UniProtKB/Swiss-Prot annotation:
UniProt gene name: scrA
Predominant subcellular localization, coarse grouping: membrane
Cross-referenced PROSITE patterns: PTS_EIIA_TYPE_1, PTS_EIIA_TYPE_1_HIS, PTS_EIIB_TYPE_1, PTS_EIIB_TYPE_1_CYS, PTS_EIIC_TYPE_1
Enzyme Commission identifier(s): 2.7.1.211
Lineage, broadest ranks: Bacteria, Bacillati, Bacillota, Bacilli, Lactobacillales
Plastid among keywords: no
Superkingdom assignment: Bacteria
Xref: InterPro entries: Dup_hybrid_motif, Glu_permease_IIB, PTrfase_EIIB_Cys, PTS_EIIA_1_perm, PTS_EIIC, PTS_EIIC_1, PTS_IIB_1, PTS_IIBC_sucr
Domain-related comment: The PTS EIIB type-1 domain is phosphorylated by phospho-EIIA on a cysteinyl residue. Then, it transfers the phosphoryl group to the sugar substrate concomitantly with the sugar uptake processed by the PTS EIIC type-1 domain. The EIIC domain type-1 forms the PTS system translocation channel and contains the specific substrate-binding site.
Localization: Cell membrane
Function comment: The phosphoenolpyruvate-dependent sugar phosphotransferase system (sugar PTS), a major carbohydrate active transport system, catalyzes the phosphorylation of incoming sugar substrates concomitantly with their translocation across the cell membrane. This system is involved in sucrose transport.
Protein's name in the database: PTS system sucrose-specific EIIBCA component
Species this chain originates from: Pediococcus pentosaceus
Active site residues per record: 25 (phosphocysteine intermediate), 562 (tele-phosphohistidine intermediate)
Amino acid sequence: MNHQEVADRVLNAIGKNNIQAAAHCATRLRLVIKDESKIDQQALDDDADVKGTFETNGQYQIIIGPGDVDKVYDALIVKTGLKEVTPDDIKAVAAAGQNKNPLMDFLKVLSDIFIPIVPALVAGGLLMALNNVLTAEHLFMAKSVVEVYPGLKGIAEMINAMASAPFTFLPILLGFSATKRFGGNPYLGATMGMIMVLPSLVNGYSVATTMAAGKMVYWNVFGLHVAQAGYQGQVLPVLGVAFILATLEKFFHKHIKGAFDFTFTPMFAIVITGFLTFTIVGPVLRTVSDALTNGLVGLYNSTGWIGMGIFGLLYSAIVITGLHQTFPAIETQLLANVAKTGGSFIFPVASMANIGQGAATLAIFFATKSQKQKALTSSAGVSALLGITEPAIFGVNLKMKFPFVFAAIASGIASAFLGLFHVLSVAMGPASVIGFISIASKSIPAFMLSAVISFVVAFIPTFIYAKRTLGDDRDQVKSPAPTSTVINVNDEIISAPVTGASESLKQVNDQVFSAEIMGKGAAIVPSSDQVVAPADGVITVTYDSHHAYGIKTTAGAEILIHLGLDTVNLNGEHFTTNVQKGDTVHQGDLLGTFDIAALKAANYDPTVMLIVTNTANYANVERLKVTNVQAGEQLVALTAPAASSVAATTV
């Protein structure tokens, strides 16, 4: 690679004066761009030395690769006259450049609160769906499964009990998560949640009927009649209570010192919050919550299939804005009161939108002749059909525009069909082709037919339009000039550099590593702080941040060991190293250490990636079928190509 020329091509594509700040990590240039609309994305996509680009958190990242990215960066700095900065510095520059949006901040808060408890709600929801399958009549036969096989009655009742728990005790889950997000003690938040669902209180689901019947029980507090009402299945009151609790706790921590703080702050916070919960905050927010729920149900009932069609048409656009982050809170409220609401109309529509986007992306896969595009659309399309739409929407459909439009139209038509048959979900789950498991049993056939409509209506016009407009879009890649260096690799077994749980690179929460753009290999969730050499070789790359190592093995493999995700931002904190560039190492030699606990405490993912960066030189790179692995144990098998083809290959 000619690093000067690569830097020139990058600057030509981006604009020499269009870069506000630049840094690099082990594999990528990290840039803050003044105006991203001026970037010649096609030039970067066609550049053989650029392995990929993406934008995240205000940074435009260009994937170059270990051993080269630092040299390209140096050339870029010289050519632009920019000041060298660290990834941590550029993170601050990017954050400062992003306009604060109160609405997006609010959505982020909701997302932070609900995402941690979603697994519990999904588990309860799917168990509820299973119970529906066992107890619903006219699903498989005239009678229910339990009626035909009475021996299953006990199992169904047990499943129903387990399914009800996350929704009945929702205030405990929400109290913990919300109080933590608001900066308070989450265990005090859970305690307030327990107080709100005490068995001695009137059950939250029966409060309205109990009051209407004149049977509500009251406390007499300083002459006030305070209803002994529970808050089972409530969302908004718990969020309000958690905010007050966290605010009071921080106030008392500030004004009460020493041992008195430890003793009295929790008590004062709970007593005051509890009093406000049952006298003012709880009743008011319950009324608001009930009004919102009734309003949504009324809107659904009054607009019918037309409203569902419009919602389906706009759903993917809502995802782009981020407003969909409010939906978990709304759905939780609808599902927690399923006896009154009948279920949620949001989940079925989300499923139609995701299926439509996936179908449109797969249509591009079958229409394009570009191998690069095929690689992207195949994985993105399947992911969308399974409920993960970001790669399809942002990576393919929005860039090409017409697939997104056809997918939105398909979603609107399919959602209107859902509205005609009053299809509702009774559980949370994957909004995808397998979403039928969360649908009310009587509506499963209508849901499946709607899914087919969404797929077909999105796929066919996208495919036809793509065939007419894409033409011959085969990759036009400029091959880098060859050198006289002959590739010489041999079969080799690469050992694990750390102890931990082995997993596929595709499971890593990073779009570069998970897409195997840098090469194939393996990931390890570490349980030991020591990092050892995975094979005999020479250290080719080290970093001041000590978060990654490059090794050229004696058998020809080029290995990148990357410790954690985005850990370059730590500038070496929590890392030590025993080697430097040019050192000869033997398999098992200690390369360095990293503090796993400190990384987790700082909210960094400590997953270790072992990447074979010259994967293209091998016939096969395979992660061995292991789960837990000790440092030094076999992890990745490399198979060299036939000797004749190796000798003839140059780079």
